[in-house]
Amino acid sequence: MGQAVEYTDLGATVHRDGLLDGAAAELDGLYESLMSTADWFATRESVMPDGACLLDRPRHVLPFTIDGDTVEVLNRTFAIAPADAERACEALFRAVPQARRIHFDAMFPPGRLRLPTRRLETTDHMVVDLPAGTEAYRASLGKSTRQNLRLYENRLRRGYPDVHTEVMIPGDRGRELVDRFVSWKVDRFKELGRTTYWELEPDMAERFTELLRRCGEAHVTSAGGAEAAISFVFHVGGSAFALETAFAPAFEHCRLGFLAQYWVVCDAAERGAACVHLTWGTPTYKGRLGATPRPATMLSVFRHQGSRLWSLDEAACAAKARHPRAAERYEAARRAARRTAASAKRRAVSLMARR
């Protein structure tokens, strides 16, 4: 629409003409988050922003799309104070009259947002906060983790004395490396009876290759004269994002996937990164590498309480998504109650026998 509206009381300006180049250039420095970069929006998410909400004091750049009555703020895994999120939502509701809800990814407790909301999904982003240097990072790990890492590395080097890792800008090899990575990932998931999102989204490999070409690097481990593991890493400001890792099935006994991620973190520490994002999922082994969870909750933010009635289908989907976890908790509680009852019965029988 080629228009911008300024709301001085909110310290906000809403542009309805896409993401301007100047605003896009600010994203990396503002958030140091791969998931809040123009490259991520264009490739991994495959969306073009319809506009951007710009805040002052403090500065924020929040690209968004509009789909009917829904505004989607595209930023992910980024820091914003609840009060600033409120300012942005108020400005967007004013600028987009037909909007009844705004989808917003919050890394603060959702209850601190003083607007009507619905919680859709919560994920834990696993992040390693790095001390200064590789040795300090290694020393920060638990004793058993350090012992296991030495065990796995020694096992790998005994079997493959030539093992080494090269950090490269993929260039023309990008698609080749992505295809090899995907083949390893698919083979491993098949053994587990699972399907990868690479199979569910056939164009994912092409989009990921473009993201890699724009801003990524490949950590390629070779052993026995062949490539054995690949990690794709993206540096944004002082943050490193270890987005994907896969390895050849023959190296399972060496725990090469675990080692590859450990080496990525060590490399980031050596290069002076402040933190490494190991993204979401598999929190147990990522925790062994020093990662701690940072919850992110996808919210529907409403203009007013009555707007909820226009999205009851969304409420049903959110409830359904939560249902399996509720069922699991119920079953766990039921089993615990059964064990308690059985234990009480055994004690009662024992007491009766003594009388």
Task: Specify the residue positions occupied by each region the protein language model found.
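A conserved beta-strand-loop-helix scaffold within acyl/acetyltransferase catalytic domains
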Residues: 2-69, 107-125, 135, 139-252
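Non-catalytic accessory segments adjacent to catalytic cores
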Residues: 84-132
